[in-house]
Amino acid sequence: MPIFTGSSSDSEDERTIHKTTKLFTRQRSIHSIFGGGKVADILLWREPKIAATLVIGVSILWFLMEVVEYNFITLICHASMTSMLFFFIWSTASDFLNWERPLIPEVVLDESSFKQLARSFHVRFNQILTKLLDVACGRDPPLFFLTTISLYIVSIIGTYFNFVNLLFIGFVSMQTLPVMYEMYEDDVDTAAGKLMRKMKKLYKKVDTNVLSKIPRGTVKNKKFT
């Protein structure tokens, strides 16, 4: 039966209050966690022009679909027709006005960028699944309860938004939270460390006052003949 000693635990927390623990006990930098390539540079705004263009483009797409209430197929068709009309006028006018004809690259979308994005997503998704399974096995009870509460809050928030809005919120979060965390990493790690220590102290109290007092029957070994 676990014994909770408040004074020793408090003194240990006081001694370790200034020791900064990385969020989720990570050992690598945020840039390396996101793959360390161009995708990480965009997410952390080290490529500001590309990141800003991506945010503006996705925001315009969300505005047209959710505010103007454009149908997705209709939006794609209208955008394609507008682009084709623009290039048609440009190509036709260039013969009469001595303009330079539009240059069409052989490769419009780079294959390596897609591979890097897929690889980064695959690695990160596996890390999340591994961490969730590790937490679910009860190896870190405070983190288990914190994760359960967080998932419950997200499930409640999800009932007030449709799928497109959730995707947009997720995209904006991915483009803002990592770079904000990188800017204020020490402050966030310190606050997260304090929160985890409080959660562990709370779990010890619950374990001592509630869980340890629940009667448990002895497990008898069954003999098979």
Curated annotation (Swiss-Prot):
Signal peptide: none annotated. The gene is RTNLB9. Coiled coil: none annotated. This is Reticulon-like protein B9. It holds the Pfam family Reticulon. InterPro entries: Reticulon (IPR003388), Reticulon-like (IPR045064). It is found in: Endoplasmic reticulum membrane. It comes from the Eukaryota. GO terms for cellular component: endoplasmic reticulum membrane. The chain crosses the membrane at residues 50-70, 72-92, 152-172.
